[in-house]
């Protein structure tokens, strides 16, 4: 170990390359959204911290804010009795769910999220603890850009040739992440950095800029195909911020005006030739801007009902359905569409303040953008970092490991060259201890089974006893996961444990009070063995949906019903007060049953749409009892 007081050499190209490759591995491995990928990334961090430890302590402001976040997150394990009674606890108790004595209703899930909070802070501290000079910064930035361009090119080829990339599970068929907004976040950051590399290379001649400009163009094409407004806004916003920083540095309105004009030209080209992307910006059917605002309203209602320190890490998804009001529909909400609101829900507004202070402490080192400090590269990184922070206000890119690691890395690359302080022996020791801990936790995560998924697999294989045991283990880890209760209820129903199954179905419905697919599937469990319970569950499914969504649900119910006239009569009762559903029933049942209810259906047909009335007339004619047109 180097004695304290000696000046360390700048971080080597190998360390910078390994850090960049780790980020790219996280992105390329499906955004590090699966347990093996998360474990591998955590193990990679551990190796870096152990073999290339931080040589100095980070800035005091970052350390204080980071410690504050850790202490605040640890309040999740304080006794719940120390805080005011929360309404959701009483609601869960009424449903037969007894929350634990801790503030967090899911302490083990909070512990897992706590590990990732420590990992994120440790990653940033390790980056800040290295001595980045201009040469290393340029190398790291070029590696990030090159890796991002390679991933985007792979995504474009896979999209064009219609072949799946192993480890990628995009919900819209493009990009490494399941969520297109997270893929767009990474592509946009890479695009802004590519423009910075082009500007830096321009000092050696315009030909040197061509590879980086081509990379930025390819990333822009990927953003258009990715169909993410957030990614495009991040790219154009980051580019504009970079122009604004250069104009501010030169005190030149001309630079700002020219830069803004170029950005507007790019925006116009995307809107003109970007296909359906313009429709999303114009508020088309796929835009969902209004729905996002409704989610924010309900998230604020949830946050208002929580203690000052939040509900504990990892609990938003479980508690949000209990506070849905403005955003009620058939979409299951997984996150609050804002990193900062998510943080406020789980760590309170104090957590938001501490996180913002930590970001300010890091980005303060980016100023001033003086000549001779590779200001073009740093200005691009600073612009990308600011744009990423703005993006996180209306999306959740920093709650995905792959996109978060890249954003944190970009923040550090924006900082000026360090003044080469003396090496801290304490920083080296702490870094290596954290590396050992990270490797141990990575091994645990790698071997940790996904009991919830295993329970479903075992249930499909009709190994119901083993499936219930796996579900019990999953509920010990996440006791408010309605999906696991539903899985266990189905297993118990198949084993003839009716009362136990009913209790689990009730718990699942309480934890997810709006999704109609839940009671719809419950009815399918009961329809053969307990038809009365199926009718009751399906009645709940109909109650949860409004027109016209109820027609699809009711059609599924009719399709799953047994061939029994008395049962179909009960299903007609579920459609009471919903004329379109009554007509749907009339179209579905055999002629004799339809004829018996012709008078009732005819009376409500006038309340339906013209196409439905015409369909009713045709059906009535087919069964030989056509009434006068209503």
Task: List each language-model region with its residue ranges.
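Internal/C-terminal transmembrane anchor helices
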Residues: 257-272, 423-450
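Alpha-helical transmembrane segments of multi-pass inner-membrane proteins
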Residues: 2-32, 36-51, 66-73, 108-275, ...
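Juxtamembrane membrane-water interface segments that cap and precede transmembrane helices
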Residues: 93-107, 164-176, 290-294, 321, ...
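C-terminal luminal/periplasmic domains and tails of membrane-associated envelope-modifying transferases
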Residues: 453-630
């Amino acid at each position: 170990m180097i004695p304290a007081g000696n000046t360390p050499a700048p971080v080597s190209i190998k360390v910078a390359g390994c850090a960049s490759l780790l980020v790219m591995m996280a992105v390329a491995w499906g955004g590090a959204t699966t347990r093996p990928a998360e474990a591998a990334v955590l193990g990679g961090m551990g190796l870096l911290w152990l073999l290339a430890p931080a040589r100095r302590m980070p800035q005091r402001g970052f350390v204080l804010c980071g410690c504050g976040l850790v202490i605040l997150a640890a309040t999740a394990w304080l006794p719940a009795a120390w805080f005011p009674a929360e309404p959701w606890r009483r609601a869960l108790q009424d449903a037969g769910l007894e929350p634990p004595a801790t503030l967090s209703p899911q302490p083990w899930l909070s512990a897992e999220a706590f590990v990732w909070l420590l990992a994120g802070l440790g990653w940033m501290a390790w980056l800040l603890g290295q001595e980045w000079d201009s040469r290393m910064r340029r190398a790291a930035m070029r590696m990030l850009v090159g890796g991002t361009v390679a991933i985007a090119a792979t995504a474009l080829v896979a999209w064009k040739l219609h072949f799946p990339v192993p480890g990628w599970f995009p919900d819209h068929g493009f990009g490494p992440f399941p969520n297109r907004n997270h893929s767009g976040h990474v592509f946009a950051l890479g695009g802004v950095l590519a423009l910075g590399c082009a500007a830096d290379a321009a000092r050696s001649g315009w030909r040197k800029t061509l590879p980086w400009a081509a990379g930025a163009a390819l990333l822009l094409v990927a953003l258009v195909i990715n169909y993410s407004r957030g990614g495009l806004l991040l790219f154009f916003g980051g580019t504009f911020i970079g122009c604004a920083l250069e104009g501010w540095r030169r005190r030149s309105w001309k630079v700002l005006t020219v830069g803004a004009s170029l950005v507007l030209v790019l925006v116009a080209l995307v809107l003109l030739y970007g296909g359906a992307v313009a429709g999303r910006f114009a508020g088309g059917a796929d835009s969902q801007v209004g729905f996002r605002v409704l989610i924010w309203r309900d998230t604020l209602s949830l946050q208002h009902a929580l203690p000052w320190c939040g509900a504990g890490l990892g609990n938003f998804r479980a508690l949000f359905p209990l506070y849905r009001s403005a955003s009620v529909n058939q979409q299951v909400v997984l996150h609050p569409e804002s990193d900062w609101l998510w943080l406020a829900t789980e760590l309170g507004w104090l957590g938001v303040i501490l996180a913002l202070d930590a970001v300010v402490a890091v980005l303060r080192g980016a100023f001033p953008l003086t000549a001779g400090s590779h200001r073009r590269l740093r200005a691009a990184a600073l612009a990308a970092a600011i744009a990423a922070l703005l993006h996180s206000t209306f999306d959740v890119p920093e709650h995905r490991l792959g996109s978060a690691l890249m954003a944190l890395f970009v923040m550090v690359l924006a900082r000026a060259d360090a003044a080469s302080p003396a090496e801290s022996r304490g920083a080296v020791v702490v870094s290596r201890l954290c590396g050992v801990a990270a490797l141990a936790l990575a091994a645990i995560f790698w071997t940790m089974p996904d009991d919830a998924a295993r329970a479903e697999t075992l249930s499909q294989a009709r190994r119901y006893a083993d499936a219930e045991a796996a579900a019990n283990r999953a509920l010990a880890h996440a006791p408010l996961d309605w999906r696991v209760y539903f899985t266990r209820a189905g297993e118990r129903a198949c084993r003839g444990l009716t009362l136990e199954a009913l209790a689990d179905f009730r718990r699942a419905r309480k934890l997810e009070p709006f999704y109609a697919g839940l009671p719809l599937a419950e009815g399918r469990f009961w329809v053969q063995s307990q038809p009365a319970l199926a009718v009751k569950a399906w009645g709940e499914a109909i109650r949860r949906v409004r027109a016209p969504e109820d027609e699809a649900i009711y059609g599924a119910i009719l399709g799953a019903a047994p061939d029994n006239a008395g049962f179909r009569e009960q299903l007609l009762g579920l459609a009471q007060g919903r004329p379109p559903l009554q007509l749907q029933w009339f179209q579905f049942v055999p002629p004799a049953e339809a004829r018996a209810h012709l008078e009732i259906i005819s009376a409500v047909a006038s309340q339906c749409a013209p196409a439905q009335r015409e369909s009713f007339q045709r059906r009535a004619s087919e069964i030989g009892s056509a009434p006068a047109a209503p």
